Amino acid sequence: MYPLLQLALSNIYAKMAHAKLDKPPKKLYVNNSIHSDLLWAVDHLSRLPGTHVLKSVDWDTSDADITAYCDVSLMGLGFWFPDQSVRFWSRIPEDPPKDTIFYFEALSVLSAIIHSTSLCTLVKRLVVYSDNLNTVQIFNSLSALPAYNDILKGSVDHLLSDIDNLIDLWVIHITGKLNIVADALSRQYFNTVVDYAPGIVVNTFSPPHF
């Protein structure tokens, strides 16, 4: 079983959602989006070992090799890694394809996933906190509308990028009141960030573009 690759079915499900149960079934037209999703799955299947890629989820947050906190405002995207005392900030990208804040919340989680492996020698278990419940749900269920599917596919690409070290990801909801540093970071309230996390290193980044 390859549960992480279920994202290849997102556009197929979206097409099937319009089918009428009281009508005879029709052939499914394979458009460019469906074709791209299926090729994405085939590419991973050609490289992955012949065992399931979903490892044990029976682990605690204290077992994580690295932890990130993410947040978004209309001013920017921000995430930070407390144990590494490193923060990342970016301006809001232009022309989001879907609901602005939700899309950028998901994009910030993907960005944290991508940067996590550059800060830790070996990442086997990664925890990411977000105060956006919808974002938490799509990453943990690997189920979203097609507009967000490229973000989820990007996360799976990174989790499976090293077949000898597949990464377990756990995205967890946190209340906004407890996500102070990431919130301040996204709003460019850097003085507040320093008050709560002295000595933290500031980096800018460019979010993935789809």
Task: Describe these PLM feature segments.
Residues 61-74:
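Two-metal-ion RNase H-like nuclease active-site motif
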Residues 2-4, 25-38, 57-60, 95-101, ...:
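Conserved, non-catalytic sequence blocks in retroelement Pol enzymes and Pol-derived host proteins
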Residues 1-57:
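C-terminal reverse transcriptase regions that engage the nucleic-acid substrate
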Residues 113-180, 187:
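RNase H catalytic domain
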Residues 12, 69-71, 79, 108, ...:
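Mobile genetic element proteins and their domesticated derivatives, centered on retroelements
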Residues 12-15, 75-77, 87-88, 134-138, ...:
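Flexible loop/turn segments at secondary-structure boundaries
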Residues 1, 167-210:
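C-terminal functional segments of enzyme domains
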Residues 82-107, 111, 115, 133-151:
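A short, polar/acidic, helix/strand-boundary loop motif
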